[in-house]
């Protein structure tokens, strides 16, 4: 598990056209919001991507880039994002090398299935039109997600690891908390406008 101010793992992944992209190129000019999805049948992933698409203008206006990493092949990722993440840069990691590098593990049965919070989230997502589907061949149904903010020095200033598969950070946290914090400086917490640090 990666921690605050730790160096972000820098890997080369493929975009939906099969072009190799090094992650450090994405955060070299401006801070990066890096989101890892689960599998393509996951309702919570579809909902998360929908929120990123909806909030993209505000996120980019605040000075952050956005990149999404999936388990799919470039071809499968292209089809998936054309429906659920139009306009977002999505990268393929079918070997899940980046998932491992960022400390994203396989969830247990209580994080992925036998959890009332997951059941409630699936029900809410279904009402929004996001259907639960089995993972495509080669994608791990137990893979956990994660969201990271990486500054231009390549440091992780916000690592978010899910407690369960429905635990993606709400858009309000990203827009009101994360984006109101000055990521050009070393992060010492807390996040949000007007937040005061605890005295030591």
Spell out what each predicted region is.
Residues 4, 10, 19, 56, ...:
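Domain-level signature for proteins that mediate thiol-based redox and metal-cofactor handling
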Residues 165-181:
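A short, polar/charged loop-to-alpha-helix boundary motif
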Residues 47-101:
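Structural microenvironment flanking redox-active thiols in thiol-disulfide oxidoreductases
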Residues 23-52, 65:
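Short active-site neighborhood of thiol/selenol oxidoreductases, capturing the structured segment around
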Residues 1-24, 47:
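N-terminal "domain-start" segment that seeds a small globular fold
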Residues 81, 88-89, 93-166:
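Thiol/selenol-based redox catalytic cores and closely related redox-interacting motifs
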Residues 184-200:
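Cysteine/selenocysteine-centered motifs that mediate thiol-based redox chemistry or coordinate metal-sulfur cofactors
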Residues 37, 70, 151:
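Short beta-strand/turn micro-motifs composed of small residues
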């Amino acid at each position: 598990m990666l921690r605050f101010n730790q160096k972000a793992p820098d890997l080369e992944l493929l975009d939906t056209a099969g072009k190799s992209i090094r992650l450090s190129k994405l955060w070299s000019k401006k801070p990066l919001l890096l989101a890892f999805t689960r599998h393509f049948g996951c309702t919570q992933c579809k909902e998360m991507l929908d929120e990123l698409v909806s909030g993209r203008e505000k996120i980019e206006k605040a000075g952050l880039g956005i990149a999404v990493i999936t388990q799919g092949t470039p071809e499968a990722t292209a089809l998936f994002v054309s429906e659920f993440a139009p306009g977002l840069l999505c990268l393929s990691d079918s070997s899940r090398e980046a998932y491992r590098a960022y400390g994203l593990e396989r969830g247990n049965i209580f994080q992925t299935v036998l959890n009332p919070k997951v059941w409630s989230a699936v029900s809410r997502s279904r009402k929004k039109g996001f259907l639960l589907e089995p993972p495509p061949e080669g994608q791990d149904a137990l893979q956990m997600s994660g969201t990271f903010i990486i500054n231009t020095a390549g440091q992780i200033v916000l690592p978010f690891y899910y407690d369960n598969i429905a635990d993606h950070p709400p858009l309000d946290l990203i827009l009101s908390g994360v984006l109101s914090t000055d990521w050009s400086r070393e992060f010492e917490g807390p996040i949000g406008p007007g937040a005061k640090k605890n005295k030591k």
